[in-house]
């Protein structure tokens, strides 16, 4: 969905509630339970309850309301957000060395997202299904199987798209937030003393009283803000104002009421700590609450899965991941895509996590490191944008960065305590993704440099061919070229081995711009290089999928008529061998060869009819 669509503000705001706030909106299922479960050495004590509630509330205010909604969301690329977008913006007006550091930060942030996304569906759905323990304790052995069944169904429907089901997301999530508010308000009315925790002094008192333990406990408090990156990442779908409006009018009040309602319940009945969320409800409402909670967690999981698809497409288009099959599940909305490989790899990982950890409390120990690590990187990148792109006063920007890091770094450091108890999981997955992305980017650059380091001038070659033309055959030949001024390998090999050339030759370059979309007016640039040679450069944004048939259609409108089924497409296929390298670079080279063998072939990437493609092989040492 885009704000360009002529929809009313209430409709867009409602849709944002259904998609953007799924993850953070299901955090009340487990956050306060993990804070006060006894793992930090104190039980359900009044000072601890007040301290945690104060910390949660002020984290929601500072991190979500101030940092992300007010500051970070100012940094957009044609309305789009996300950690890779922020990386791109931050590196626009900096030196090459600084840009390299910012790129590494952005890739680490993107990798952290991959690490955390395996945990989100598992902990969300398991937390909802665990409500069965309250309804029927004898069914506790069914929590893991039921969680797997629910998520299996969710991953299976991905290939059909979520357009139809997505229409239900908004009303379900709005109902969910109203239930959160209603349950919390009911409990607060019975024990209004809990509202004293709105005073930030209770958070300070908590640190003074519990000292070191209170710092470690921040690792549980951070569960209340998981999913905060979705606010920024989904900005392009809904716009800044609807996302902000949804937060301040519905989401923040509902979360606050529910957390404080759970606190009021615990002050009256400390034994409710086993599941304070579900015990807020009267007995007659437990089963309906269990059902709506399961639906809300499925929606939260769906938002995360869609986020992975979007991030993967962006990484592929920007050259950080190998090409893979991307299926559009909606003719109306370009953002609705399905990536089979990512879908099923994620599914397998989620199932393994559920079977291994068995309970959401165990998963909570793995949650937080990647989230807080991304928060630190977002602070650095966004303030870099403020200084370099917006030209804010450097001292003011420094104060903002210090303020952000004073919150982010303690949260990240506190979560490092979870490293051995589960935090290794997202870090390991994130590390793997970082290695994969940097390997593909660097080795691809090395390959292209190796292929073109001995290349001749394109203009000189065309002039030579026009002066002493080889045998010409009827028809049009299109040579795919990765760079504008470089002779395509396929063209050189065709001349070398076949010694013929078509009557009309088009050198086609498909380029990804640093923007989500490219206007149709700027889509295709045509340049006639000689009487028989043309250069066509087609530009796409990183949220768009290149399509050669569309390019030809636009060429026809510009006077260069081409028919797909009467054109031969020449492409080079590199057979790679590893040269002499140090052992660590040799390992990276082997990983690249593995990625290259499994990458989507160019004809499939650009939707070129297979019977019109001629691939010419060449051996390249890297």
UniProtKB/Swiss-Prot annotation:
Record's function text: Responsible for the low-affinity transport of potassium into the cell. Likely operates as a K(+):H(+) symporter.
UniProt topology in membrane: Multi-pass membrane protein
A Pfam family matched in the record: K_trans_C
Gene Ontology, cellular component aspect: plasma membrane
Protein name per UniProt: Low affinity potassium transport system protein Kup
Catalytic activity as recorded in UniProt: K(+)(in) + H(+)(in) = K(+)(out) + H(+)(out)
Subcellular location field: Cell inner membrane
Keyword presence, Transport: yes
Taxonomic superkingdom: Bacteria
Similarity annotation: Belongs to the HAK/KUP transporter (TC 2.A.72) family.
Membrane-spanning parts: 9-29, 49-69, 103-123, 137-157, 165-185, 213-233, 247-267, 276-296, 337-357, 363-383, 396-416, 419-439
Disulfide-bond pairs as recorded: none
Single GO MF descriptor: symporter activity
Keywords tagged on the record: Cell inner membrane, Cell membrane, Ion transport, Membrane, Potassium, Potassium transport, Symport, Transmembrane, Transmembrane helix, Transport
Keyword presence, Transmembrane: yes
């Amino acid at each position: 969905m885009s704000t360009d669509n002529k929809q009313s503000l209430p409709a867009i705001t409602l849709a944002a509630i259904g998609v953007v706030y799924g993850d953070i909106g299901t955090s009340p299922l487990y956050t306060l339970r993990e804070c006060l479960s006894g793992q930090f050495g104190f039980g359900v004590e009044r000072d601890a309850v007040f301290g945690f509630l104060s910390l949660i509330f002020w984290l929601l205010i500072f991190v979500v309301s101030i940092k992300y909604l007010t500051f970070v969301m100012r940094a957009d690329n044609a309305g789009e957000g996300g950690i890779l977008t922020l990386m791109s913006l931050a590196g626009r007006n900096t030196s090459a060395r600084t840009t390299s550091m910012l790129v590494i930060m952005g890739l680490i942030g993107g990798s952290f997202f991959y690490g955390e996304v395996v945990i989100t569906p598992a902990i969300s759905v398991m937390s909802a299904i665990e409500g069965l323990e309250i309804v029927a304790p004898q069914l506790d052995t069914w929590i893991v199987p039921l969680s797997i069944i629910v998520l299996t169904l969710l991953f299976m429907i991905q290939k059909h798209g979520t357009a139809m089901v997505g229409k239900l997301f908004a009303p379900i999530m709005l109902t969910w937030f109203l239930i959160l508010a209603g349950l919390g308000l009911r409990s607060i009315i019975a024990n209004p003393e809990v509202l004293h925790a709105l005073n930030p002094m209770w958070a300070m008192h908590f640190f003074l009283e519990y000292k070191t333990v209170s710092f470690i406990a921040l690792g549980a408090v951070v569960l209340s803000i998981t999913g905060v990156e979705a606010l920024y990442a989904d900005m392009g779908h809904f716009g800044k104002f609807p996302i902000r409006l949804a937060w301040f009018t519905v989401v923040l009040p509902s979360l606050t009421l529910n957390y404080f309602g759970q606190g009021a319940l615990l002050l009256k009945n400390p034994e409710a700590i086993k599941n304070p969320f579900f015990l807020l409800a009267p007995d007659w409402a437990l089963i309906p609450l269990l059902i709506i909670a399961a639906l809300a967690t499925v929606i939260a999981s769906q938002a995360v899965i869609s986020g992975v698809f979007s991030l993967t497409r962006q990484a592929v288009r920007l050259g950080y991941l190998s090409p893979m099959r991307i299926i559009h599940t909606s003719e109306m909305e370009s953002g609705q895509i399905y990536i089979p490989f990512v879908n099923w790899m994620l599914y397998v990982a989620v199932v393994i996590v559920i079977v291994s950890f068995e309970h959401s409390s165990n998963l909570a120990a793995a949650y937080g490191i990647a989230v807080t690590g991304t928060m630190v990187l977002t602070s650095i990148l966004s303030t870099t944008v403020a200084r370099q792109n917006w030209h804010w006063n450097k001292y003011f920007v420094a104060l903002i960065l210090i303020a952000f890091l004073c919150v982010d770094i303690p949260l990240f450091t506190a979560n490092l305590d979870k490293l051995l108890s589960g935090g290794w999981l997202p870090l390991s997955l994130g590390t793997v993704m970082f290695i994969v992305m940097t390997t593909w980017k660097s080795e691809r650059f090395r390959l292209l440099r190796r292929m073109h380091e001995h290349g001749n001038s394109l203009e000189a070659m065309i002039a030579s061919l026009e002066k002493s033309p080889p045998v010409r055959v009827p028809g049009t030949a299109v040579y795919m070229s990765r760079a504008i001024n470089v002779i395509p390998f396929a063209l050189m090999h065709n001349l070398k081995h076949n010694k013929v050339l078509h009557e009309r030759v088009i050198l086609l370059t498909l380029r990804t711009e640093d923007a989500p979309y490219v206007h149709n007016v700027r889509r295709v640039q045509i340049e006639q290089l000689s009487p028989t040679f043309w250069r066509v450069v087609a530009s796409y944004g990183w949220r768009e999928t290149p399509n050669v048939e569309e390019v030809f259609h636009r060429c026809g409108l510009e006077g260069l008529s081409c028919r797909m089924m009467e054109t031969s497409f020449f492409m080079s296929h590199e057979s790679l061998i590893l040269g002499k390298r140090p052992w660590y670079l040799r390992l990276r080279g082997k990983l690249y060869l593995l990625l290259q063998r499994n990458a989507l072939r160019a004809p499939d990437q650009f939707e070129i009819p297979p019977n019109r493609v001629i691939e010419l092989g060449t051996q390249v040492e890297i």
